């Protein structure tokens, strides 16, 4: 699991 990618996706949603 790429946490960096998840973090970027979450930032985009937020």
UniProtKB/Swiss-Prot annotation:
Entry annotated with the keyword Secreted: yes
**Would the keyword Secreted be found if you checked this record's keyword annotation?**
yes
One GO molecular function term of this record is: ion channel regulator activity
Expressed in which tissues: Expressed by the venom gland.
* Top-level taxon: Eukaryota
Transmembrane regions: none
Mostly located where?
A: secreted
UniProt keywords, alphabetically: Ion channel impairing toxin, Neurotoxin, Postsynaptic neurotoxin, Secreted, Toxin
What GO CC terms are in its UniProt record? extracellular region; host cell postsynaptic membrane
Its annotated compartments are: Secreted
Q: Which family does it belong to?
A: Belongs to the MCD family. Mastoparan subfamily.
Record's function text: Toxin active in modulation of gamma-aminobutyric acid (GABA) neurotransmission. Increases GABA release and inhibits GABA uptake in synaptosomes from rat cerebral cortex. May acts on GABA transporters, since its action on GABA uptake and GABA release is not altered by the presence of calcium, sodium and potassium channel blockers. May also modulate GABA(A) receptors, since it significantly decreases GABA-binding in synaptic membranes from rat brain cortex.
Q: Can you name this protein? A: Agelaiatoxin-8
User: Which organism is this protein's natural source?
Assistant: Agelaia vicina (Wasp)
């Amino acid at each position: 699991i790429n946490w960096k990618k998840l973090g970027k996706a979450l930032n985009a949603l937020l």
